[in-house]
Amino acid sequence: MESIKQKVPQIKICGITQDEEIQWLNEADVSYAGFVLYEKSCRYIPISKSQELFEKLNENIKKVAVAVNPDVTMVKQVMDAGFDILQVHGNLTEEVLAVTEIPVWRAVNLTDANIFEKLVREYRDLSIDEKITALLMDAKEFGSGKTFGWDAYERDEGKEMLRQLRQILEKEQIRFVLAGGLTPDNISRGIDIFSPDIVDVSSGVEKELGQGTGKDREKIQKFVRNMHSIV
């Protein structure tokens, strides 16, 4: 675990909807840009619009399609558009895994520590599909601006469950992504508790927290600056 803590987590900015936000991501030199393809989200944009935006991204920034219960048709559209990664919330079917030719980030929306404990049990001794390259831990409703109850993972029982999960992920060479309520002000605590490989922020760098009001350049810069100063 010590070797993990020494790594600087990569950054994903999620919920990109505007041209100016692309410029800010390029300036900040983040690793991933997320585009929400879920129509019920306040950050939703169609695949065609996402494509128009991400064509202006720096080449080193990976393009992540954020989907909820995607079907085979949608996955094919995502691949045709040129996305680099498929992030799946909700149901991930065998059919989707079979057809996808890009890496999959499996998102888990946590409501409490019991869900996390169940997750550890499911992943233990499980043969995980090689297309799943990351596990993303998020709050109950992604993009809500709320964390998933970090206090539980600062106690001994929570620390042990987290340790077990990290061991499983490392064995399977699956990256650990921390999402859900991250902000420039709490990123230090999040990294200290979870030692993630990647941090995923959306509402925490918006003009108004959790309102889908568009990103704020200064908050993006502060998030990146604060993260690098504590690792």
Cite the ranges covered by each PLM segment.
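Conserved N-terminal beta1-alpha1 strand-loop-helix module at the mouth
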Residues: 1-231
